[in-house]
């Protein structure tokens, strides 16, 4: 089994409820969405293993990734992207010698069914202002994904909402309410450099039905990957 990867590296988690835990990051190439604020390349001829200081030709073998997982001293293995669900079969082929932490845009419900074994799910709820085509269809797929990968005693699932300067607070509130029973909490994440006043007002409304926190991309402030 092989997969197209952008990079492999060890660092701390810089987003969401688990900020600061040490993780092995496996960043997949390719995404089914095109959010205007995305800062990750979609394709790469090579995969950079930044911790091992190696350059690998894509696609990278599951055996290589498994070796990196087994040798790492980390809290968990973070599968990120891109969109890791596009290569769900690759993730499913790996052995969980460390807990698996999935970061996903939550728009591929059929793929989500193959990843129920993940221990942590950091799932996105995209806002209309992200500039996606067929937004209403995307949102319905997101609801289905959260239902498949809902929070349980064995799987910790939360929702991250990336917010630009301008967004429809009522629509975000109503969308979050639809998935509140599938997550243990929400993270409102400002697009890097955005103002937060409107986000703080939204948080005040959302805490009526869920643990809701405003958390920026901390790794960018620290200057780490």
From Swiss-Prot:
MF terms in GO? 4 iron, 4 sulfur cluster binding; carbon-nitrogen lyase activity; magnesium ion binding; S-adenosyl-L-methionine binding
Domain of life of the native organism: Archaea
Binding residues annotated for S-adenosyl-L-methionine, in chain numbering: 82
Q: Does the keyword Membrane apply?
A: no
Name the residues that bind substrate.
Answer: 12-14, 27, 80
Which residues are noted in the entry as Mg(2+)-binding? 40
Please tell me whether the keyword Nucleus is annotated for this protein: no
* Entries under Gene3D superfamilies matching the protein: Aldolase class I
What is the required cofactor set for this protein? [4Fe-4S] cluster; S-adenosyl-L-methionine; Mg(2+)
Q: What class of enzyme is it?
A: lyase
**Pathway in which this enzyme or protein is active:** Purine metabolism; 7-cyano-7-deazaguanine biosynthesis
Domain named Radical SAM core: residues: 18-225
The record's listing under InterPro entries reads: 7-CO-7-deazaguanine_synth-like, Aldolase_TIM, rSAM
Which catalysed reactions does the entry list for this protein?
6-carboxy-5,6,7,8-tetrahydropterin + H(+) = 7-carboxy-7-deazaguanine + NH4(+)
Q: Which UniProt keywords apply?
A: 4Fe-4S, Iron, Iron-sulfur, Lyase, Magnesium, Metal-binding, S-adenosyl-L-methionine
Q: Can you quote the record's cofactor note?
A: Binds 1 [4Fe-4S] cluster. The cluster is coordinated with 3 cysteines and an exchangeable S-adenosyl-L-methionine. Binds 1 S-adenosyl-L-methionine per subunit.
Q: What is its EC number?
A: 4.3.99.3
Give the signal peptide, or none. none
**Family of this protein:** Belongs to the radical SAM superfamily. 7-carboxy-7-deazaguanine synthase family.
What role is this protein assigned? Catalyzes the complex heterocyclic radical-mediated conversion of 6-carboxy-5,6,7,8-tetrahydropterin (CPH4) to 7-carboxy-7-deazaguanine (CDG), a step common to the biosynthetic pathways of all 7-deazapurine-containing compounds.
**Partners and quaternary state?**
Homodimer.
The record's annotation in HAMAP family points to: QueE (MF_00917)
**Name used for this protein in its record:** 7-carboxy-7-deazaguanine synthase
């Amino acid at each position: 089994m092989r997969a197209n990867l952008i990079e492999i590296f060890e660092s701390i988690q810089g987003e969401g409820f688990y900020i600061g835990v040490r993780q092995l990051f496996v960043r997949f190439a390719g995404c089914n969405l095109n959010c205007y604020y995305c800062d990750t390349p979609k394709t790469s001829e090579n995969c950079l293993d930044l911790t091992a200081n190696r350059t690998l030709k894509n696609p990278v073998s599951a055996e290589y990734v498994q070796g990196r997982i087994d040798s790492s001293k980390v809290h968990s293995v973070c599968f990120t992207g891109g969109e890791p669900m596009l290569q769900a079969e690759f993730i499913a082929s790996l052995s969980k010698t460390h807990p698996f932490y999935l970061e996903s845009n939550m728009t591929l419900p059929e793929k989500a069914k193959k990843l129920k074994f993940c221990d942590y799910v950091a799932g996105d709820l995209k806002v209309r202002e992200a500039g996606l085509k067929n937004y209403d269809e995307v949102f319905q797929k997101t609801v289905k994904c959260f239902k498949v990968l809902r929070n349980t005693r064995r799987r910790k699932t939360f929702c991250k909402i990336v917010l630009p300067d301008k967004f429809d607070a009522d629509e975000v509130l109503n969308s979050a309410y639809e998935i509140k029973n599938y997550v243990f909490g929400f993270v409102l994440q400002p697009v890097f450099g955005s103002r937060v006043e409107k986000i703080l007002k939204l948080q005040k409304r959302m805490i009526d039905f869920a643990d809701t926190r405003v958390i920026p991309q901390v790794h960018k402030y620290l200057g780490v990957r």
